[in-house]
Amino acid sequence: MTPSQAKLLIVNADDFGITEGATDAIIECHRAGSVTSTTLMTNMPAAAYAAQRAREHPALGVGLHFNLTSGRPLGAAAGSSIVDSRGGLLNGRDLALRAITGRLRAGAVR
């Protein structure tokens, strides 16, 4: 690859799939040339919509948004130390509190 072919800056848009509106905004930024990649939140309500939009724009790089603090877990997590009493993922503060107080069980994330 010659220096003129190398990408000098990668602009990644976070939270692809969190909502249809956010997903569409990321696609529009990509089409305008300002976003080169994004990370998909696979457990969010608009994840399937985002996956479809990504297929329509194959030049958009899509990676995984590793998410432990928003929405509901994709796998079986009942009774897990990373979920709240309603079955949703803990927010960042509560997850950190469990970790530093020793209440985050090994194997909770797999």
What are these regions (language model features)?
Residues E20-P45:
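A short alpha/beta connector and helix-capping loop motif
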Residues I26-A32, A50-G61, S81-G88:
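Acidic (Asp/Glu)-rich catalytic clusters
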Residues G61-L68, L90-G92:
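Non-cysteine beta-strand/loop elements that form the S-adenosyl-L-methionine
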Residues P73-R105:
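Active-site gating loops and adjacent loop-to-helix segments of metal-dependent hydrolytic enzymes
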Residues D14-F16, M41-N43, H65-G71:
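Active-site beta-loop-alpha junctions enriched in small/polar residues
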Residues T2-E20:
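Boundary/entry segment of secreted carbohydrate-active catalytic domains
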Residues V109-R110:
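CE4/NodB-like, metal-dependent polysaccharide N-deacetylase domain
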Residues L8-I10, V35-T39, A59-H65:
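Structural preference for beta-strand elements that scaffold enzyme active sites
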